């Protein structure tokens, strides 16, 4: 297994790998290389090139606009050099995210209080249909949270999901909270749902909540 560092500001160096040894040992046991980069255009090309049965969603418009490399990152898992899983995250406040979401996806929105301090939004989770059921996506999500908290120094990581995936986000991705965010009549929210999906939730964890879950989440890596 190798760490591939193609990011201008954030890297997976030896000290960082040792800090999260159990997590990286899992990737090594699966013969996976882990890449961090800041090429969001390539990420879009990877996801939009997939057939509907491999990636069912439109690309998340949050990652369409210009992104400063210092405020976000892309993660890939590679198997025999093929990209087999993705994730992305960027610094963004909840009010800004919701304001932008309302412009693209009109609907009935709940009021959710802003998070204290800097927050990070994450999306674009995908695992190749040929490699699902191996815990790769779940463990990559955990690495993404660690990077948001450790390297980007965020206090909260949040994501949105369709209502059917609430259990997955809370009990498998180990977010500490999930609240209903909006009813979107047209559905089809990029990175989160298809046309049939009308109800969307926000899942989130603070850095303290994530630290308190470490004993629990590390059992996934064995």
Q: What does each model-identified segment do?
A:
Residues 61-64, 73, 106-114, 143-146:
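Short secondary-structure capping micro-motifs at structural edges
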Residues 132-148:
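Conserved acetyl-CoA-binding loop-helix of GNAT-fold acetyltransferases
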Residues 88-121:
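Conserved acyl-donor/pantetheine-binding loop and adjacent beta-alpha core of acyl/acetyltransferases
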Residues 64-75, 94-99:
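A short helix-loop-beta-strand connector motif used in the catalytic cores of GNAT acetyltransferases and
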Residues 71-86:
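Conserved beta-hairpin
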Residues 77, 89-91, 127:
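GNAT/GCN5-related N-acetyltransferase fold signature
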Residues 1-59, 114-118, 125-130, 149-222:
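Terminal substrate-recognition subdomain of acyl/acetyltransferases
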Residues 88-94, 140-145, 163-164:
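Amphipathic alpha-helical scaffolding segments
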